[in-house]
Amino acid sequence: MASLDLGAGAGPEDPIYHYHSSYDSYHWMSEFGDVGFITHRVMGEYLTLLAYHLADDPIIPFDLSNYESELDIYLADLEETLSSSDLEGAANLDISALQTSVANFIDMAQRATDYAAAAMDSGNEEALHLVNGKLRDFHRGFTSQGGLPNREFFRHVLFAPGLDTGYAPVTFPGITEAVVEYGNITMAEEWVVKTAAGIDVAAGILQP
């Protein structure tokens, strides 16, 4: 379920990028945007190297420690959303189950990281296979609770494209959208439970 977002941004002296216009063309890119397609080539080389490591490293190179900082940010954002909402009951919504699940996931992620390091040191094939299976599968826990309200196709409990934010994601979308978009505190309570459950499933997959 993991995905990758890779892109190149303009520098301060670069020409304007005619995004989604008739001037967004091969001619513009070849003459102005990336003359010689140097950036394109480097990005292709990087992706090739990344794919090589994902396929050939003894352990899939995922940095589970990144989840700790990101989940802390997601929780802080949710708390701010709830405290600033005019929806009756939002400021007092009980998210303790979610906080407990996040803490448990962070603990399991650290234990899985330690187990992966020990497996690498030992070179034990069975242990390496077990670790890789966990790293491959744990994201499935985040999609284990059914689709989001009114858009069943989106199933991830940690983030999803916003209903009206274009490419920008919404974190803890089931809870956040229940409050911000639907004004439904009962739905928010339901998705606190579902979100916590999805995180627990992911943590259970990671558990050594």
Where are these regions (language model features)?
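Secretory-pathway/membrane protein signature
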Residues: 1-208
